[in-house]
Amino acid sequence: MATETVELHKLKLAELKQECLARGLETKGIKQDLINRLQAYLEEHAEEEANEEDVLGDETEEEEPKPIELPVKEEEPPEKVVDMASEKKVVKITSGIPQTERMQKRAERFNVPVSLESKKAARAARFGISSVPTKGLSSDTKPMVNLDKLKERAQRFGLNVSSISRKSEDDEKLKKRKERFGIVTSSAGTGTTEDTEAKKRKRAERFGIA
């Protein structure tokens, strides 16, 4: 404050008046009055500035640095893990074995005798052959005789063609008569007759007998 007072004394009256005007003080009076006014003004403001510095110092001491809060990222719910075992599809495998073959295998497994019809059906199904039912067929069915072939063979060996054709006609008539009257010959008898006729035919061809 002594230095400020010395400086004020060094100032001229005009300069003192300007200082008073700048601070809003009265400019009337002698030089000493102006110096006193300026000193009183400076002392007051010096105390105010000191008080302000003390207050500001206390506030700065009280204010502690706040910790910086980082934004917390929300945890996302875990994705659902697909249970692969539960999604496995059960595929039913159907067997491509025919019914007849399965019946045959089942019979073999349990030692059950298999009928002849089921065996034939299984064999036909295995090889892709359409099985023809044997029931309902008469046992006296004979293979059809080709008359043209018989005639050619008879002419080749010099046999009488008329006798062969007549014999075949007689056989046909006999067969029709049996069918008309419901006469059914056994398969054994049919086989014997066919063998006898074949032997006779071969013998006639060998010796050239008409």
From Swiss-Prot:
Claim: Thylakoid is one of the keywords in the record: no
Gene3D superfamilies per record: SAP domain
Residue stretches of biased makeup (Basic and acidic residues): 65-87
UniProt KW keywords: Acetylation, DNA-binding, mRNA transport, Nucleus, Phosphoprotein, RNA-binding, Transcription, Transcription regulation, Translation regulation, Transport
GO biological process: mRNA export from nucleus; negative regulation of transcription by RNA polymerase II; poly(A)+ mRNA export from nucleus; regulation of translation
Stretches the record annotates as Disordered: 45-87, 161-210
Sequence ranges of Polar residues compositional bias: 184-193
Naturally occurring in which organism (per UniProt): Rattus norvegicus (Rat)
Gene that encodes the chain: Sarnp
Molecular function terms from GO: chromatin binding; DNA binding; RNA binding
Name of the protein in question: SAP domain-containing ribonucleoprotein
Acidic residues composition bias: residue spans: 45-64
Source species taxonomy: Eukaryota, Metazoa, Chordata, Craniata, Vertebrata
Record-linked SMART domains: SAP
Domain SAP: 8-42
Subunit structure, interactors included: Interacts with DDX39A. Interacts with FUS. Interacts (via the C-terminal domain) with DDX39B; the interaction is direct and facilitates RNA binding of DDX39B. Component of the transcription/export (TREX) complex at least composed of ALYREF/THOC4, DDX39B, SARNP/CIP29, CHTOP and the THO subcomplex; TREX seems to have dynamic structure involving ATP-dependent remodeling; in the complex interacts directly with DDX39B in a ATP-dependent manner which bridges it to ALYREF/THOC4.
